Amino acid sequence: MPLRAAEARPHLRAQGWTSLSKGFQIIGRFSEDIDIRIEPPAALDAKVGKNQTKPAHIQSRSDFYDWLTKTIVIDGITSVARDTSVDNRDLFSAGIRLTYKNVVTPVEGLREGVLLEAGFAKVTPNEPRDISSWAYDYAVQKVEIIDNRAKAVACYDPGYTLVEKLQTISSKYRRQQESGDIPVDFMRHYYDVYRLLQQPSVQAFIGTPEYLKHKDEHFPRADNKNIRENPAFLLTDEKTRALYESAYEAGSALYYQGKPSFREILATLAEWKDRL
């Protein structure tokens, strides 16, 4: 769904799926989540520095998310409520659930509603992009409709997103191996990395001092940032590989522009692992 509040664009920063799909149109999959940074009004005095973790600082961020929940008004949205299930421990990110009246048959594999993941993650460097949706792009060719696209929204650089996707895969793989859970919830990140590796600008970014610096800053100590040695990208264990391939296929309904096979994704990772 498009972000309609174009009048608020100086305060909006798109990242993650929102930036890759709706801003740069690199990936073609659905998501219930909208990853976005909305700058708090100065009057709220929300503390957003990464080292501001005192109880009063955390409370200021909680107050901001509560304010945002009460402030959001979007055509077609019937309710707006906090969803604390995805909240970061220190509330550097938090969930807001948007619900709407569904007029079509629900798609298997998609949760109802939209989860707005608001937070204060790094969103620079970025560039202005118009935010659209597959529904708008289709409908505008058929009938006259209101242009509800958000124009010139600052979208996070895809090269930096690649680093963060690699870290996400690594961390989620490690936790999945510890818990034994079925890994459906993060298989989409393998697809995202595959698509990012097709982009010339991302290819040019890999190996640069900025790329290496972002890896150093973003990977936790528990994860091996050397991709060619990290088991999350090798999947040499046959049972684990089969489990992941099955989980990837189980999410097929998410991909509206088709998708590569999981073997193709792993083959691409094998080609790039020495540079990543």
List PLM regions with ranges.
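Glycine-rich beta-strand-to-loop/alpha-helix junction loops that act as flexible
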Residues: A14-T18
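Structured mid-to-C-terminal alpha-helical surface segments
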Residues: M1-L12, K22-R29, P40-L276
